[in-house]
């Protein structure tokens, strides 16, 4: 339950999760994201990644290891997610949680809008299908990385209703596709 998660992890009601450990994102940038969210009365918690040692620059953090269901609930009950990995992005979209994505995937390709070959990043493809490229950047194109003020604005301006509608549409499309496959 939400109460269980809030109590177990000692979370404030208005919390945002940040999970950025790529070397191209500075500790200063991450700390400034925390400051900007605090101005809007949100507490930022560092969500650790299983495959990387965490940078300890934020005031609050979730301790690792995390039970998979608790990990899911941490995202589900949050007010926002700022991070780089695909699975938390999917979890956020599934629950219409506002997000800002820092994509670390993809092969660089000149003259592409986000500095990558769009077909080489699953995160880009997902965010693009949801129409959320304003909430997206790629480390392969450093100029696309938003300022902390822009990140907070993107998260707070997130259209949850549009996200829910798109998720439902994609679920319907998937179910239709699977039904068509089963009819063959």
Model-inferred region functions:
Residues 1-184:
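Active-site anion-handling motifs in enzyme catalytic cores
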